[in-house]
Amino acid sequence: MRGVSFFGEWMRKHYLLVSDFDQTLSFNDSGLVLSEMLGINGFQERVASLSRLNLVQSGAELTYLLRHDNDFRGVRRADLIEVGKRIRLKGNIALLAELLRDGIDGFRFDFYVVSAAPWEVVNSALVGIVPPDHIIGTHFTFEGPDETVGEIVQVHAGYGKVAAVEALRLRLGVPTDRVVYVGDGSSDIHVMLHVNRGDGLTIAASETRLIAQIATRTVISDDALSVLIPVLEEIGGYDATRIRLVFEEQGLLIQEWDRVRTDWLTIRDGAAVESAA
């Protein structure tokens, strides 16, 4: 593997890095993709209506619709798996997972995905990238020969994400100040506040007002590897020159880095850029 000077086998500190899925590792909302696949109109309007009523925790709207909306009843396990295959992922998730697993300059990371989306959707989207036992999503029972969605077993939205992250932290024996959480929307507010209280690092993957105000850092990019920027700066103490070197060791160039209050990044394959020059 390239970059052995930065990614050694000997680790000094153990961290837990948890990421949301919808619009954090992907460009899509799982519920919207499911609606479009099944030809169901008005998904966003239904979600907005549930939000106005405060009927469910933020992020759990799809779960509610799957159980209580006539148009969504009868969705099968196979449908959820197919949705995952249609999700458009951000770039370099596999490389991000590899670098976190192998360690960064003496820091070792356990990488987990915690999402309010159905587990089958997230697992299908990330198959071969993130191990199934490192994905925590909403679980249902499935009924009958068609395996249609049945009862809700567990939802990881709102305070459910807090419980999931805390359970992971305790199981892995990670101190509160060595937790990193990455999220994009209102369903991440509670868990970000929880991580902040423990002096962990929170990273917003969108400029959603509430999240950007809570998160330690905000990074906007279509490449999942951009998460490493605040990790390397805040945890590793890297400056911009050293960060660029880390990316170059992996054959990547940070082509654009517009730093205001938000880090905007465009990451390109280094070999492709050099051949085009």
Model regions: which residues?
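C-terminal cap/substrate-recognition subdomain and adjoining C-terminal extension
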Residues: 84-277
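Alpha-helical substrate-recognition element adjacent to the catalytic core
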Residues: 1-139, 222
